[in-house]
Every structure is written in C-alpha cells, then in structure tokens.
Amino acid sequence: MPHSTLLLCVIGLLAFSSACYIQNCPRGGKRALQDTGIRQCMTCGPGDQGHCFGPSICCGEGLGCWMGSPETARCFEENYLPTPCQTGGRPCGSDAGRCAAPGVCCDSESCVLDPDCLSESRYHSPADHSAGATSDSPGELLLRLLHFATRGQSEYKQ
C-alpha cells in the first residue's frame, strides 16, 4: 500500500509540473521561447500607420496618439501574443516610456508630453528640413503652444 501511494504522488507531481513533454516541446527546448528577440509591436490606426504602445494606445508619426478609440482595438490582441514587443523611438520619461509621436512619450498605460521627444529627428518630415522651410509645421506649433500652456508634464490617462 505505501508503494502505491508513493507512486501515485510521483505521478501526480509529474502531471502538475511544468516539464517539457515530447508532444508539447517548442523547437529548441523549453527555454527556446525566452531566447527569441524582441519583435516590433503590431501596427494600428488608420491605414496601419501607427504602432501599439499598450492595450488601448496607438501612436504614429503623422497621426499623433489614439487612446481608447476604435483605432486601438487591434492593440488589445498584443496581450495574447507569447513574445514581448518594443516600439520604435528612443527611451523617454519613465523607464518603460518611448517617444511615440513628436513631443509625446508613451508607456503601456499612459502618455505624457515630453519636450525631449520633439528633438528626435525621426519625427520631422522631410518638408520641414527643406531649404525653403523656415518655420515649424502647424502641428509642431500647436504642440509647442500646448506644452507652454501646461508648463510641465501633463499626464493623460485612459
């Protein structure tokens, strides 16, 4: 009787353990999934021109940021993918923040105005750098006025 109880306990522990059985092993072993690189986050927004920054945040170079709108519905699918993603732009604001649009820094939960994201050259259109262009675009002017009016980091939460 004690041998059958011990055998039953061992079989029970094996059934509930996270061992890699032959039928469900990923290629390369059970640690292979952790070795994969960080991928680009899903595209979103009108014409798939933006990238997901969180489950309900979609930002793009020419779009600005959409929060909690129908354009962000696709971003919710990012939660179901097994590998992590990283959006473009340089780090800003909090530890997990990234420059999402000109003057906007987003993490997975919120976005804040950040003047450091204004100076990033990847967010300026080629027309702004042409020989005949001496003033800012209307969007940049509006963003600077908004930043001036808020005087600091105004946080927008969903």
Swiss-Prot record:
Keyword NADP (UniProt): no
Compartments where found: Secreted
InterPro entries documented for this protein: Neurhyp_horm, Neurhyp_horm_dom_sf, Neurohypophysial_hormone_CS
Positions of disulphide bridges: C20-C25, C41-C85, C44-C58, C52-C75, C59-C65, C92-C105, C99-C117, C106-C111
Major localization listed first in the record, in broad terms: secreted
Name under which the protein is recorded: Vasotocin-neurophysin VT 2
Family as reported in the entry's similarity comment: Belongs to the vasopressin/oxytocin family.
Function: Vasotocin is an antidiuretic hormone.
